[in-house]
């Protein structure tokens, strides 16, 4: 066994703040080293008892709110704070592996998953880590050609010395305003990814015209490279113009990696998309039920509404924990595509205050009641869409469980029909 070094400095004492999946991955990794003491702070009461200045390094889990007491004090020790991805980078930086980091409010999970899928389909060894669910350090012993990393703004705030070969920001819209003072601060957190990337591009920041599309453009539901048609959405297993936008981001990533785009197009045609992201569950009694439980902010729900239909035939299930979201931003899409809204969850009155007077709606006790009322109201050729624009932890363990419950409710409805 060896001692643990970070930036060529021997680390003998480390404090871990937070012990979720990320914290556990750090702890498991450090178990491979000797001469290091690791203290773990798992809650507020424990944290205040530690002398932060006595530690060589402090690792902080992304879920720890640095803007709230008692954790604000951590900002005074910025030079000691590292993320799990910084540690991961220290141990792969001298290999030939390429690292790609993607952040954004909406679409980043689709982009990183599609990128990883294409790389593997082209015959490369690729790993997918980060905010998508697998901590980077869990993959430290594997050999790979490419490492695709989904990063959140919370993770970027913790970065110390990581250097990605390529960084990319997509689709930044208001989110996590319970954690940031305003949208500008949140957007800047995302843009800070550039400081940790050797190459970098931005594809759309809140429709402010900051968009690098390279040689690609969308014309009538298809992607063109200059004047050559590459791909029609109908040739894929995806739907909606937002997925064409996601594909353009992936193509630009692959371009910058120097890979063959024509071969990549064949791989993209096989990609099935993500669970709980604009997935058709079933058609029951002529009504189509769509699961977009991964739509956890206003921007994601707007993207779903704008992509699913050209008619005013959506019955929308909306609600959960709003995270300070600005629901007035969806009024235009509600007016154009939504027949009725069922609002549920912890912040239903908050959501109501934004959309009252702009659409027909009803408040519900929970998602199950919202579903039951929606299925009763829906007619043939209409759509019941779960795209909550909210986090799920008031009622569920996460967006995946919320989506699974929705799918089960659809299955039960089909059995009764």
From Swiss-Prot:
Molecular function GO terms recorded: ATP binding; UDP-N-acetylmuramoylalanine-D-glutamate ligase activity
Enzyme class: ligase
Keyword Secreted: no
GO cellular component entries: cytoplasm
Main location, first listed in the record: cytoplasm
GO BP term, example: peptidoglycan biosynthetic process
E.C. designation(s): 6.3.2.9
Binding, ATP: 104-110
Pathway(s) annotated for this protein in UniProt: Cell wall biogenesis; peptidoglycan biosynthesis
Keywords: ATP-binding, Cell cycle, Cell division, Cell shape, Cell wall biogenesis/degradation, Cytoplasm, Ligase, Nucleotide-binding, Peptidoglycan synthesis
Compartment annotation: Cytoplasm
Family assignment from sequence similarity: Belongs to the MurCDEF family.
UniProt cross-references to NCBIfam families, sorted A to Z: murD (TIGR01087)
Role, per record: Cell wall formation. Catalyzes the addition of glutamate to the nucleotide precursor UDP-N-acetylmuramoyl-L-alanine (UMA).
Protein name per Swiss-Prot or TrEMBL: UDP-N-acetylmuramoylalanine--D-glutamate ligase
Gene symbol of the encoding locus: murD
